[in-house]
From Swiss-Prot:
GO terms classed as biological process: photosynthetic electron transport in photosystem II
Recorded topology in the membrane: Multi-pass membrane protein
Protein name listed in UniProt: Photosystem II CP47 reaction center protein
Subunit structure: PSII is composed of 1 copy each of membrane proteins PsbA, PsbB, PsbC, PsbD, PsbE, PsbF, PsbH, PsbI, PsbJ, PsbK, PsbL, PsbM, PsbT, PsbX, PsbY, PsbZ, Psb30/Ycf12, at least 3 peripheral proteins of the oxygen-evolving complex and a large number of cofactors. It forms dimeric complexes.
Family: Belongs to the PsbB/PsbC family. PsbB subfamily.
Job of this protein: One of the components of the core complex of photosystem II (PSII). It binds chlorophyll and helps catalyze the primary light-induced photochemical processes of PSII. PSII is a light-driven water:plastoquinone oxidoreductase, using light energy to abstract electrons from H(2)O, generating O(2) and a proton gradient subsequently used for ATP formation.
Alphabetical list of NCBIfam families matching this protein: PS_II_CP47
Gene field: psbB
Binding note for cofactor: Binds multiple chlorophylls. PSII binds additional chlorophylls, carotenoids and specific lipids.
Source species of the chain: Ceratophyllum demersum (Rigid hornwort)
Keyword field: Chlorophyll, Chloroplast, Chromophore, Membrane, Photosynthesis, Photosystem II, Plastid, Thylakoid, Transmembrane, Transmembrane helix
The keyword Transmembrane appears for this protein: yes
PANTHER family named in the record: PHOTOSYSTEM II CP43 REACTION CENTER PROTEIN
Record's subcellular location: Plastid, Chloroplast thylakoid membrane
C-alpha cells in the first residue's frame, strides 16, 4: 500500500475486527513488559537492608507499584519489610509477575484469533451490511465495566474487605506497612496525604461510572449532538481516549513529584520539597529537643534518632539532584549507604555552636559557610585564603559527633573539620560504598524523578495528539473539501479550488 509511517494505522480504520486485534496485542505487550520487568528487577534487587538500601535507592520501578497495592513477600523467602518468611502464597512478587506474563500470552493468542477471524457478524450493521460499530453503546459498556472495577478496588481491595489493603505510612516514612484503610467521607478525604481518600474516591468515582455507564447504555445521544461531536467516527474515540490518558498522566506526574498518599516515600523515595523545606531536619531536631527535655545527654538524644529518618535528611536522596540524562540507580551515583556516621556539631573557639549552611537543590557546588544560632556568619572555607577572616584555622572550629558510628568522637585539626563541614552541606553524613557498583560519585534521581519526567513528557505529547485527532475528526469535511452530507458524487481533481461551484458532479 506504500503508506508513510505516520499513516500506517489507516489499515484498521474501517476494520473493527482487526482494530480489536491490534488493541489486544497492545495489551499483551504492556502486560508482558510489566511481568518481564518485574522478574528482571527481582533478579537484581537486594532486599537485605530495607533501611539504607531500599528499593528506590536501587532504582526499582515496578516493585514499588506492586508493594503499594499490598504485595510484600517473595518466593525467595524474603519480605520487603525485612526478615524471612516461609509461605509467601500465590500473590507474591513472582506470582504477580507470572500472572502478567500468562495474561500476556493469552492476549497474544486472542489477538491472533481476532486478526484471522476479523469478519464477525457482531461487527456488521444489519441495515447496510457494512462493518460498523455502535460507538455510544460501546462507550456505555466500557464506562460501566471500568466503574465496576473502580468501585471494587475502593470497596474491597483498599478497605481489606476482600484484599490486602494498601501501603500506609506515617508522615516521615518510618512505620510503613500494608494495612486495610477505611474510607474518609469528610473533608479530610480531599487531603492528598490521607489514605482514606483513596478508598472513598474510588467508591464514589466507581459509583458514578456505573450510573453513567447505565445511562449511556439506555439513552441514545440526540442527533445534533451525535453529528456535532462526530460520534460515528472512530477518530472521535481516539481523540477523547487520548484526552483521558494525557489528563491522567498530568495528574499522576503531579502526585508523584509533590508527594501524596499514593506515592509513599518508603517506596519511591522522598520528594525534593522535603529537602528544600528542611522537613526531616526539623523532625530530627524536634526529637532531639524532646530527648534533652527528658534529661538525656546530647549523645543519648541523637542516638535515639532512627537511622531511616537520618537517611531521608541527606541530599543524595533528593530526586531533583540527578540529571535527566544520568542513567542508573541512586546506588550507581553516590554509592550504597553503609552506615550513619552521626550528627556533627561544630563549635568555634568561643564555644558557640555553628551550623553549616546546607546546599540548595539546584547547586552542584556551594560555599562552606558556618553560621551561629542567630544566622551570623562565624566561619567558612574561604576561596581566597589571603583575604580570609573566618577560616576554620582562624576561628578555631572543632567538630564533635553525636549518635551514629562516630558517637562521642571529636576532631580539632582543620583539615578533618573542613572535610566534615563540606559533607555536612549535604545533610546527615553517611558512609557510602562506591566500590561495589563502581559508583561514580555523581548524584542520580530516584524512581520518583523518572516517573514524573516520563509521564509529564508523554502527557505533553498526548495533549498534542488529542488536539491533532480532535481537529481531524471535527473538521474532516473542511480538510477533505467534501460536505459529509453530500448526496452527489464529486469528480475529484477537476475543480480549481475548494468549494468551487463549477465543480462537475454526478447525482447518484
Amino acid at each position: 500500500m506504500g503508506l508513510p509511517w505516520y499513516r500506517v494505522h489507516t489499515v484498521v480504520l474501517n476494520d473493527p475486527g482487526r482494530l480489536l486485534s491490534v488493541h489486544i496485542m497492545h495489551t499483551a505487550l504492556v502486560s508482558g513488559w510489566a511481568g518481564s520487568m518485574a522478574l528482571y528487577e527481582l533478579a537484581v534487587f537486594d532486599p537485605s537492608d530495607p533501611v539504607l538500601d531500599p528499593m528506590w535507592r536501587q532504582g526499582m520501578f515496578v516493585i514499588p507499584f506492586m508493594t503499594r497495592l499490598g504485595i510484600t513477600n517473595s518466593w525467595g523467602g524474603w519480605s520487603i519489610t525485612g526478615g524471612t518468611i516461609t509461605n509467601p502464597g500465590l500473590w507474591s512478587y513472582e506470582g504477580v509477575a507470572g500472572a502478567h506474563i500468562m495474561f500476556s500470552g493469552l492476549c497474544f493468542l486472542a489477538a491472533i484469533w481476532h486478526w484471522v477471524y476479523w469478519d464477525l457478524e457482531i461487527f456488521c450493521d444489519e441495515r447496510t451490511g457494512k462493518p460498523s460499530l455502535d460507538l455510544p453503546k460501546i462507550f456505555g459498556i466500557h464506562l460501566f465495566l471500568s466503574g465496576l472495577a473502580c468501585f471494587g478496588f475502593g470497596a474491597f481491595h483498599v478497605t481489606g474487605l476482600y484484599g490486602p489493603g494498601i501501603w500506609v505510612s506515617d508522615p516521615y516514612g518510618l512505620t510503613g506497612k500494608v494495612q486495610s484503610v477505611s474510607p474518609a467521607w469528610g473533608a479530610e478525604g480531599f487531603d492528598p496525604f490521607v489514605p482514606g481518600g483513596i478508598a472513598s474516591h474510588h467508591i464514589a468515582a466507581g459509583t458514578l461510572g456505573i450510573l453513567a455507564g447505565l445511562f449511556h447504555l439506555s439513552v441514545r445521544p440526540p442527533q445534533r449532538l451525535y453529528k456535532g461531536l462526530r460520534m460515528g467516527n472512530i477518530e472521535t474515540v481516539l481523540s477523547s481516549s487520548i484526552a483521558a490518558v494525557f489528563f491522567a498522566a498530568f495528574v499522576v506526574a503531579g502526585t508523584m513529584w509533590y508527594g501524596s498518599a499514593t506515592t509513599p516515600i518508603e517506596l519511591f523515595g522522598p520528594t525534593r520539597y522535603q529537602w528544600d523545606q528542611g522537613y526531616f531536619q526539623q523532625e530530627i531536631y524536634r526529637r532531639v529537643g524532646n530527648g534533652l527535655s527528658e534529661n538525656l545527654s546530647l549523645s543519648e538524644a541523637w542516638s535515639k534518632i532512627p537511622e531511616k529518618l537520618a537517611f531521608y535528611d541527606y541530599i543524595g536522596n533528593n530526586p531533583a539532584k540527578g540529571g535527566l540524562f544520568r542513567a542508573g540507580s541512586m546506588d550507581n551515583g553516590d554509592g550504597i549507604a553503609v552506615g550513619w556516621l552521626g550528627h556533627p556539631v561544630f563549635r568555634d573557639n568561643e564555644g558557640r555552636e555553628l551550623f553549616v549552611r546546607r546546599m540548595p537543590t539546584f547547586f552542584e557546588t556551594f560555599p562552606v559557610v558556618l553560621v551561629d544560632g542567630d544566622g551570623i556568619v562565624r566561619a567558612d572555607v574561604p576561596f581566597r585564603r589571603a583575604e580570609s577572616k573566618y577560616s576554620v584555622e582562624q576561628v578555631g572550629v572543632t567538630v564533635e559527633f553525636y549518635g551514629g558510628e562516630l558517637n562521642g568522637v571529636s576532631y580539632s585539626d582543620p583539615a578533618t573539620v573542613k572535610k566534615y563541614a563540606r559533607r555536612a552541606q549535604l545533610g546527615e553524613i553517611f558512609e557510602l560504598d562506591r566500590a561495589t557498583l563502581k559508583s561514580d560519585g555523581v548524584f542520580r534521581s530516584s524512581p520518583r524523578g523518572w516517573f514524573t519526567f516520563g509521564h509529564a513528557s508523554f502527557a505533553l505529547l498526548f495533549f498534542f495528539g488529542h488536539i491533532w485527532h480532535g481537529a481531524r475528526t471535527l473538521f474532516r469535511d473542511v480538510f477533505a473539501g467534501i460536505d459529509p452530507d453530500l448526496d452527489a458524487q464529486v469528480e475529484f481533481g477537476t475543480f480549481q479550488k475548494l468549494g468551487d461551484p463549477t465543480t462537475r458532479r454526478q447525482v447518484v
